[in-house]
């Protein structure tokens, strides 16, 4: 009788723990960073790059990730080891991902290793909102379609031509187009020149609306930065 009571208590505690886990997951982040990167700035660094097995990507910004983040600058990661990347769940998105979310890491790959990393590190932490892999990757693709950075910049006469542009003009061009302030991340080319690398745009915790970023990442750019060719 005592053993049955103990087992029942164990089950109750297990259920309570699981419920609390679900509640905590729902509160595990405050907003998303949606990050796009310029391939020319990835490839002209000292570490260089490798084109994916599908060939050289288009000269366009590519998705880096959709990352849950907290207002204090911390972020959750690797939240659900029971939800490994499963490409069969996103088979209808692969063609679009190869175009809009290409890998440039070496050695050359199809993109699956990159996408697996993004899902398992970041996507699993958004399951309370974007409930499965298809929803997560589709949301990122939809945001890419919504925020056409290259067209925005070219419309402001800012082109990937290897020339330098004022950082404030790049930031203002994007803000004028989307209504919110982006964060510009720079890296340096092989000659040590500061260049446009990644653009961070913030999305609310439901994944439905762009917002002003509650906090920006660290790092800084020069007042004038290159926009390299690709």
From Swiss-Prot:
* Coiled coil regions in record: none
Q: Which reaction does it catalyse?
A: a ribonucleotidyl-ribonucleotide-RNA + H2O = a 3'-end 3'-phospho-ribonucleotide-RNA + a 5'-end dephospho-ribonucleoside-RNA + H(+)
Q: Which CDD domains does the entry mention?
A: RNase_T2_euk
Signal peptide residue numbers: 1-25
Pfam families, alphabetically?
Answer: Ribonuclease_T2 (PF00445)
GO BP, sorted A to Z: RNA catabolic process
Instruction: List the Gene Ontology MF annotations in alphabetical order.
Output: ribonuclease T2 activity; RNA binding; RNA endonuclease activity
EC numbers, comma separated:
4.6.1.19
**Cystines in this chain:** 43-49, 50-106, 79-125, 186-221, 202-213
Instruction: Tell me the superkingdom of the source.
Output: Eukaryota
Instruction: Write out the GO cellular component annotations.
Output: extracellular region
Catalytic positions? Answer: 64 (proton donor), 118, 122 (proton acceptor)
Task: Report the InterPro entries cross-referenced here.
Answer: Ribonuclease_T2_eukaryotic (IPR033697), RNase_T2-like (IPR001568), RNase_T2-like_sf (IPR036430), RNase_T2_His_AS_1 (IPR018188), RNase_T2_His_AS_2 (IPR033130)
The entry's localization annotation reads: Secreted, Extracellular space; Secreted, Cell wall
Q: Which residues bind RNA?
A: 37, 64, 114, 117-118, 121-122
Q: What induces it?
A: By phosphate starvation.
Alphabetically sorted, this entry's keywords are:
Cell wall, Disulfide bond, Endonuclease, Hydrolase, Lyase, Nuclease, Secreted, Signal, Stress response
What does it do?
Probably involved in plant phosphate-starvation rescue system.
Q: Which family does it belong to?
A: Belongs to the RNase T2 family.
- Tell me the protein's name: Extracellular ribonuclease LE
Species source reads Solanum lycopersicum (Tomato)
Ranked from the top, the taxonomy reads: Eukaryota, Viridiplantae, Streptophyta, Embryophyta, Tracheophyta
């Amino acid at each position: 009788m005592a053993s049955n009571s103990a087992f029942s208590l164990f089950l109750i505690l297990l259920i309570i723990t699981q419920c609390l886990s679900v509640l905590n997951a729902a509160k595990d982040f405050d907003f998303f960073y949606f990050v796009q990167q310029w391939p020319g700035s990835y490839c002209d660094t000292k570490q260089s790059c490798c084109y994916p097995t599908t060939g050289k990507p288009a000269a366009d910004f590519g998705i880096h990730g959709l990352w849950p983040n907290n207002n204090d600058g911390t972020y959750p990661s690797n939240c659900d080891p029971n939800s490994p990347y499963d490409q069969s769940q996103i088979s209808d998105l692969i063609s679009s991902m190869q175009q809009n979310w290409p890998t440039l890491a070496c050695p050359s790959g199809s993109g699956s290793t990159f996408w697996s990393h993004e899902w398992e590190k970041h996507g699993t932490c958004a399951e309370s909102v974007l409930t499965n892999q298809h929803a997560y990757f589709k949301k990122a693709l939809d945001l890419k379609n919504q925020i056409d950075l290259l067209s925005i910049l070219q419309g402001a006469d800012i082109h990937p031509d290897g020339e330098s542009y004022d950082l404030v003009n790049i930031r203002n061009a994007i803000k004028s187009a989307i209504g919110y302030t982006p964060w510009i991340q720079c890296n340096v080319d092989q000659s040590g020149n500061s260049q446009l690398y990644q653009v961070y745009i913030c999305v609310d915790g439901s994944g439905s609306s762009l917002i002003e970023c509650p906090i920006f990442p660290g790092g800084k750019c020069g007042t004038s930065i290159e926009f390299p060719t690709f």
